[in-house]
Amino acid sequence: MTAAPHILLVNPWIHDFAAYDFWAKPLGLLLLAALLRQHGCTVSYVDCLDRFHPRTPATDPQRRCGRGPYLKTRLPKPAALPDVPRRFSRYGIKPEWLREDLWSLPRPDLILVTSMMTYWYSGVQETISVLRDIFSDVPLILGGIYATLCREHARRNSGADRVVGGAAEAVLLDLVADVTGFSPAARFDPQDLDTYPHPAHDLQHRISCVPLLTAKGCPFACAYCAAKKLNPDRMTRSPEGVVDEISRWHRDFGVRDFVFYDDALLAQTEHHAVPLFERVIRHGLKIRFHTPNALHIRWITPAVARLMKRAGFETVRLGLETAGPSRWLEQEQKVTADEFQRAADSLKQAGFAKRQIGAYLLAGLPGQSFEEIATSIQIVKDNGVTPILAHYSPIPHTDLWPAAVTASRYDLAADPIFTNNAILPCRKDSFCWGTITRLKTLLAD
């Protein structure tokens, strides 16, 4: 058999008007790194978003529960967005640091680059350009969310040799064999999450938090969400496996902050979330849980809220979307004001403070009125919960995409840069700071 290859995995820069590390880690890429190590490969990891790079000022990784600002470098604004009066930046380490890090590595046999938001693709392009300068003859494969949702655009514009959509772990060993000739027998089952190794968080310079995925896929099919496209099949892990992972990172690396990346953590509550929370409680782990992806409100009962509190939940985010009528939310999935109140009351009675509970409200949907958003904000505040606006970003392959294309002042299908939620892409008129200011005033009142 061909000798085990050296594979470089890279998390690219972000190019955007604004970006902040709200527990953002390239979980999929770090899982691939773990799988490659499990099968005998040598792996190297470079994170262009590394807030703890050796060249940055020392920062406590546990500050802000693992969150924090990225290093920022001003860039020219994209020529396609002249109507947006905001500064555009590269977020992440300096280019010269990246080049130094790459020069210090042995030549890899294969490079794997991930991607996140579709409208961050210029950051992917710049990252790949630097990789090409250093390792011009090394095969480079691009995967991730942008590669999945905008595959043809990525093929034409990213600079990668190959673009892979969907769950890369299912085809990882075949890709490695095809490029390098190294073909070990699989030591995991892509359809059984309990056979996967723990993601290789130890490759990071510092571990500020550990993202957890207790299940893949979502039982819902919301019109604005791409979860079904990204992970069409629902697969769950055993509570024992999840707690073993938590215990390892807490015990061996001192990690306190754990972040659920699940699309539907509370789905099948009695068979999945409840046993998990109970096992965490029995282990007596002094840790903090955060739910930036939002919890489904209907599944939060007084009993579930009490378990969450005892298990160590610190940051609770609820997926309200809108408290008013909406043609974009299926009626059976729409949460009523009464259901929201019951969930909020359950959390508060369990001991959660107002600062710990936030409700996401979608803003900027096609045809959505300012009054609808204002009504939703007031309902959230009336229930003693913090409203958090989630500005809508149009996503290809979702049911809402055609309406977004019709509503936008941009040609969304022509360039993913136009789907950036920071530019309010579904307004027919030009970008307006007044709308943002009015919404911020409502949130603050």
Feature annotation, model-predicted:
Residues 8-14, 19, 24, 46-56, ...:
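C-terminal accessory regions of radical SAM enzymes
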Residues 159-160, 309-315, 383-386:
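Glycine-enriched alpha-helix->loop->beta-strand junction motifs that scaffold or abut catalytic
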